[in-house]
Amino acid sequence: YKADRLLSGGTGKVKGVTIHNTNDLKNVEEDAEQYTRATWPNANMNDARVHYYVDDVNAWQNLREDEVGWHAGDGRKATGGNETTLSIEIIMDGSGSKEDLKAEENGVLLAALLLKKHGLSVNELYTHNHWMGHPDSIVQGARKNCPLYILPHWAQFKQKVAAKLTELNGGATTTEAGKTEIMGKAKASAQQMALFARSK
C-alpha cells in the first residue's frame, strides 16, 4: 500500500466496487470502528487497506474514494481490483444472527450508494474471488475464499444490491456506463445516509 495513489492510472476514476468479508470481533459492539482504529493510527493491519468497513451498526471510511487500496490480491495490475475499485469489508461471523443479517443489509446499502454515486451498475459489483481468478462461489482448496459468508448466496446478494440501486434511482434501472432507462428522482433516507456519517 502506498498512500495517496489515485485509482485508474492516476485519474481517480472508480470503475467498480469489491465486496469482502472479515470476521466479527467477539464482545465488540462497533466492529467497524475497531478495524478502522487497527488501521489508523495503530498500523496493525500491515499493508491491507480497504475503503470501508461496515458492521451491523454503521460504516467507517478508511481511504478516500479516489485512492488505491490494497485488498484484492492482484497486486498492481492496471485493470485489477486494487487499482480500479472501491472495497467494502462486511463484518460477519456466518452465524445468521440478526447482527450478521443487519451487517449484510448495511453492506447492500453501502454498495448500492457507491455504485449510484459513481455512475455504475450492478455489473460492476465484484467479489474478492473474482480478482484472484476464481468463480463467485466457494472454491475447495483455494488460497482464499472471499467474501466467505456471502459467496454461497452471491447471486441473491447481487440481486439485493440491484434492487436497492433501482430504489435509489427512483425506480429507474441503472445500465452500463451509468445510464438510466428512465430518469427518476434519487431518494435516500436520513437513516441510509447515516452510514456515511462516521469516517476517519
Summary of predicted features, one role per range:
Residues 1-121:
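Active-site-adjacent loop/helix surface patches within enzyme catalytic domains
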Residues 2-11, 86, 91-181:
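Basic/polar, cationic surfaces and motifs that engage anionic cell-wall
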Residues 24, 132, 196:
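Alpha-helical and His/Cys-centered functional microenvironments
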Residues 27-31, 127, 145, 191-194, ...:
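Secondary-structure junction/capping motif
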Residues 28, 45, 142, 147-150, ...:
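Short linear sequence motifs
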Residues 34, 61, 140, 156-159, ...:
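Residue-identity detector for glutamine
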Residues 177-200:
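Short, solvent-exposed alpha-helical surface patches in non-cytosolic proteins
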